[in-house]
Amino acid sequence: MATLSLLSTGVGAAITNRTPSASLTFITGSRTTNKRVSFNGGSARSGSLHCSFLAPSSSLSSNFSGLSLGLDLTSNTGVSTDRCRRFVVRAGKAALCLTKRSRSRKSLARTHGFRLRMSTTSGRALLKRRRAKGRKILCTKTNPSSGKRASP
């Protein structure tokens, strides 16, 4: 069974020469592994250390599948502080530059129409469910260019 026994972060011994470091000790069954990582002036890109450890399948227990550590070393001496930029999705108002918000029936029919529903297995299953429910209109977004609903 793999366990994390020691996790420490520290700085160098000299006050003038401060180097961020991390020390990890892993105990896997009968073996103990010590790992020590330190950052020098330009060797690292960010101020955070990301370690991940996955135990081998021979010592893998059912209740331990892996360990992922993210250490944020606050000392920024000689280390650039690039932040991870994440894409944030927000539900908000429509942009001011968009004047036409509605789409034409033809473009809606291309993505939600009867012919598209019939071309896929899940679409045919959807049509089958709507028929069983008794819906008169199977696909509401179909472009009525021909048939009963066509305008003269």
From Swiss-Prot:
One GO cellular component term of this record is:
chloroplast
User: Does Transit peptide count among this protein's keywords?
Assistant: yes
This protein's UniProt keywords: Chloroplast, Plastid, Ribonucleoprotein, Ribosomal protein, RNA-binding, rRNA-binding, Transit peptide
> What is the extent of the transit peptide?
1-91
Does this entry carry the keyword Chloroplast? Answer: yes
Quote the InterPro entries the UniProt record gives: Ribosomal_bL34
Biological process (GO) annotations held by this record are: translation
One GO molecular function term of this record is:
structural constituent of ribosome
Superkingdom of this protein's organism: Eukaryota
Where, subcellularly, is it found? Answer: Plastid, Chloroplast
Family label: Belongs to the bacterial ribosomal protein bL34 family.
Q: What does this protein do?
A: Component of the chloroplast ribosome (chloro-ribosome), a dedicated translation machinery responsible for the synthesis of chloroplast genome-encoded proteins, including proteins of the transcription and translation machinery and components of the photosynthetic apparatus.
Tell me the PANTHER family matching this sequence. Answer: LARGE RIBOSOMAL SUBUNIT PROTEIN BL34M, MITOCHONDRIAL RIBOSOMAL PROTEIN 34 FAMILY MEMBER
Assembly mode: Component of the chloroplast large ribosomal subunit (LSU). Mature 70S chloroplast ribosomes of higher plants consist of a small (30S) and a large (50S) subunit. The 30S small subunit contains 1 molecule of ribosomal RNA (16S rRNA) and 24 different proteins. The 50S large subunit contains 3 rRNA molecules (23S, 5S and 4.5S rRNA) and 33 different proteins.
Any idea what this protein is called?
Large ribosomal subunit protein bL34c
Source organism (scientific name): Spinacia oleracea (Spinach)
